Amino acid sequence: MHEKYVPSDVESAAQGQWRAIDAYKTTEVTDKPKFYCVSMLPYPSGKLHMGHVRNYTINDVMYRYLRMNGYNVLMPMGWDAFGMPAENAAMANNVPPAKWTYDNIAYMKKQMQSMGLAIDWSREVATCSPDYYKWNQWLFLKMLEKGIAYKKTGTVNWDPVDQTVLANEQVIDGRGWRSGALVEKREIPMYYMRITQYADELLNDLEGLGWPERVKIMQQNWIGKSFGVNFGFPYEIDGEQKLLRVFTTRADTIMGVTFCAIAAEHPLATRLAKDKPELQAFIEECKRGGVAEADVATMEKKGMATGFTVTHPLTQEQVEVWIGNYVLMSYGEGAVMGVPAHDERDFAFVKKYGLPVRQVVAVEGKEFSTEAWQEWYGEKTGTLINSGKYDGLNYEQAVDRIAADLKELGLGDKQITWRLRDWGVSRQRYWGTPIPIIHCPTCGDVPVPEKDLPVVLPEDLVPDGTGNPLARSEAFVNCTCPTCGGAAKRETDTMDTFVDSSWYFYRYASPGAKTMVDERTDYWAPMDQYIGGIEHAILHLLYSRFWAKVMRDLGLIRFGEPAKNLLTQGMVLNETYYRENEAGKKTWYNPAEVTVSFDDKGRPVGAILNEDGQPVVLGGVEKMSKSKNNGVDPQLLIDQHGADTARLFVMFAAPPEQSLEWSGSGVEGASRFLRRVWSFSQANEAALRQGGTFDAAQLSDVEKVLRREIYSVLKQADFDYQRLQYNTVVSAAMKMLNALDSAKGARPAVLRETCSVMLRVLYPVVPHLTFQLWQELGYADELGSLLDAPWPKVDEKALEQSEIELVLQVNGKVRGAITVAKDASREAIEQLAAAHEMVAKFSEGKAPKKIVVVPGRLVNVVV
C-alpha cells in the first residue's frame, strides 16, 4: 500500500468499484428484514450546503450499519424541482426555469456522488418530470371525484402593477417585492383539499409515531382542537333579525365583553360601509394587509368604529361593532368578541382606542389594574366576578352554565373547532404542476380525461414578473372541451409545491410503475426512518400525513402514516462578521475573508477584513445562510480534505439532533485522525496481512488488554449506532486506534482480529478509506467485501478480568488505587486498603474508624 494517504485517490478508486458493481441498487427480497431510510429531498438550488452534507451523511451511516447487520436497506434520492426560486432565477438570468433546474440537478447529483453516498440512483425522482407530476394530476382528479378536492373563492395578495398574485413572503411592508406597489387582497376562485376532514385522525395518530415530541406538539398546536362555545349577538338591519356569530374558548368571560370586532371582508362590514367613505377606505386598507395568520400576529392592530351596535345575548346591553385588521375572515366566523380584561390582544386594542375594560375573573391575592397587562389576566384559574348569577363559578362551571343558557335562548351551544384550515393548492405561478381542468363556456369546469394525462407544462417559457406566462401561452391555454368538443381553455393555475413533496417516497419505492404506485411500495413503505430539518415540522410533514391517509382511503397503500420514525437533524452554525453603514445597512463577510484575534483563553476578541485590514464586527454564531454569508462550500472541503474527512467531521462534531458549530480546527482534527488510521495500517501491513490464529488461553497481558479494550468499545459503539448517536461512535473508533497503537508486541493474529473490528466500526462513517484498507490488508479475501461484511460480534470472554482496579479514598478524597482479585471478599479488600501506603500517609497514624467498600468501584478509608 502507498505510504501516504491521498484522499482523492482512495475515494476515486472506491467509488469506481462501487459503480462497476452497482453496489447500491436495491431490490425487494423476502429473506431479509427491510429498512427504508429517506432524507427529505432537496430543492435544486445550485450547490449542496453543509446542511445537506450532514443530513445525507446521517442517512448513509444508517444505511451502511444496517446493511452490515443483514438488512435489505434502501436509500433513494430525488429533487423537489418546482417552485418560485426557479422562476426568480429564470428572470434574473433570462433562461427558462427548466434549464436552470436541470443544470442544477446535474451539478448537485455529481456533488452527492463525490460524497460516496449509498444512493440507489435507479429510483431517482424529479418532481418537474411529467412522468412524476402526471400522478399529482391523477390523484387530484380522484380527490375531486370523492369531494376531497373542491373549488371556492379564496383571498390572495395581488400586485396591481405586475398583475400577479404574490406569495406571503413576497409582500414586504405591504408592498410587492418587485414592483414596490401597495398590495391588495383579492378574492379569486381556487382549489382546496379537505385536510380538515382528517383533523381528528391527524391529531390522534401522532401518539403512535416515533417522532420528536417537539414536532408532535407543533403539529398538535397547528391542528388546534379547541373546545368552546359558538354563539350570536342579535342585531337588526334593513328590517331583518340576524346574529353576529363568534366562537370563543373563553365563554366564562362573556360578561366582560365591551366591543365586537369583525373582519374587513365580513358581510356586515360591507353593508355598514355602504354610505361611509371612511369605512370603505379603512376596509380597503385592511385588504392590503397580509393574508397569513403570521402576518396578522405581528402587524400593528388597527380598528375603526362602525357606529353600529349588536345586543349582548345575556345582558341585553348594546355592544359597539368595530372593523379590525387583525380579524381574519378565513378563521372562525370572521368576528370576535372583545374582552380586554382577559385577552392581551383586546387589551392592547382598547388601550389604543379608549374603550372600556370590565374585569370579570378574579384570582385570589392578585390585584387587577387597567394600566398594564399582566399574564394572570388571561389565565383560567380564577373565579367569576361582576357576572351576575355566574359570580363565584370557576372556569369549567361558568362555561357549562353559560353554554346551557345560550342554548336555551337559541343563541348558541358548545362546539369543537379546529385551527386547521383546508389546504389551498392553487398557485398563480408558472413553474408547477398544471391543474388538470378545462374551462368550457358550455360545460363549465371539465376534468381532463385520464387518458389525456399528463397535462404537460411547457418548459420553454421565461417569466418576466408580470402575470403568469402560462396564461399568455396560447399553445397551452387553447384546447378542445373533452365533453362537447367545443373551443375551451385550460386552467393556468398550478399546484402548491407541497403537493409534489407529499408522496415522492412512495414513487421511489415503485420506479417506472405504470400506476401511481404498485406492490413494491407495500414492501418498502412506510418509511422506517425519515430525516430532515425542524423547519418542515408543520406544513410538509402534516401534508404528507394527510396524503398518506387519502391514498390509503383510495386503496393505493395499506397504511395511514408516511414515516414510523423521524429524525430532525440540528442546524450547522458558523461565526458571522459584518460592517454597518450610516443608514444601518449591514454588509456580511464570509469567515474565510476575515482574520480573528483571540485572548489568552482562546476567546475571539476582534477581527479584521483581510482585504483592507480594517475591523469588522463579530456577529456571533448563527445558522449558515446566504443572507449572513457565513456558509462553507462543501465542494471546497471535499476537494481539499476528501469526502471522508467531511463526513467524519459532521458526524463527530455533535449528536445528529443537535446544532453543529463549524470548526476549521475540527476539520483538521478529522483529517489528522484518518491519516493516523492509514499510517497505522501501512506501518503494520505485513503483520496485519500475515494474521493467523491464536489461543485465547495463551494471550499476553498486552494482548488481553487490547482485546478487552476493543470489544468493550465495540459493545458501546454498537449501542450508539442503534440509538443514532454517531458522534460517540467516532469517539469509539478513536479509542480503538489508540488501543491498537499502544499494543506493542501483540502478535499479528491478535492485531489482525482487532484491526478488523476497528475498520468495520469506522466504515459506515468513513466508507472510502476503510473500504480501501479492507482490501489492501486482505480482509476482503476472508470476509468478503466490506459493503456486506458481517458486523463484528462482541467476544464476551475477552471482557472478563481476573483482577479489577478500585479507587482508593481516604476520608472521601481520592488518594490512589488498589488492584484486587475480581472475586475478592470485602474483608480482603479492607485489609489491602488499610495496609496501603497512601492510607498511612494521610491518616497521620490514626487507626481507621471504618472502611466503606463500593463493589467494583471504590474503597473509602475513614479515619
Curated annotation (Swiss-Prot):
Q: Where in the cell is it found?
A: Cytoplasm
The Gene Ontology biological process annotation of the record reads: leucyl-tRNA aminoacylation
Q: Which GO terms describe its cellular component?
A: cytosol
Q: For the motif 'HIGH' region, what are the positions? A: 42-52
Pfam families named in the record = Anticodon_1, tRNA-synt_1, tRNA-synt_1_2, tRNA-synt_1g
Reactions catalysed, semicolon-separated, are:
tRNA(Leu) + L-leucine + ATP = L-leucyl-tRNA(Leu) + AMP + diphosphate
Motif 'KMSKS' region: residue span? 623-627
**List of residues binding ATP:** K626
Query: Molecular function (GO) terms listed?
Result: aminoacyl-tRNA deacylase activity; ATP binding; leucine-tRNA ligase activity
Alphabetized UniProt keyword annotations: Aminoacyl-tRNA synthetase, ATP-binding, Cytoplasm, Ligase, Nucleotide-binding, Protein biosynthesis
Question: Could you tell me the EC number(s) of this protein?
Answer: 6.1.1.4
Protein origin, superkingdom:
Bacteria
Q: What class of enzyme is it?
A: ligase
User: For this UniProt entry, what is the primary localization, expressed as one broad class?
Assistant: cytoplasm
Give the family this protein belongs to, as stated in its UniProt record: Belongs to the class-I aminoacyl-tRNA synthetase family.
* NCBIfam families in the record: leuS_bact
Which HAMAP family does the entry mention? Answer: Leu_tRNA_synth_B (MF_00049_B)
This protein is called what?
Leucine--tRNA ligase
Native species:
Paraburkholderia xenovorans (strain LB400)
Q: Which gene does this sequence derive from? A: leuS
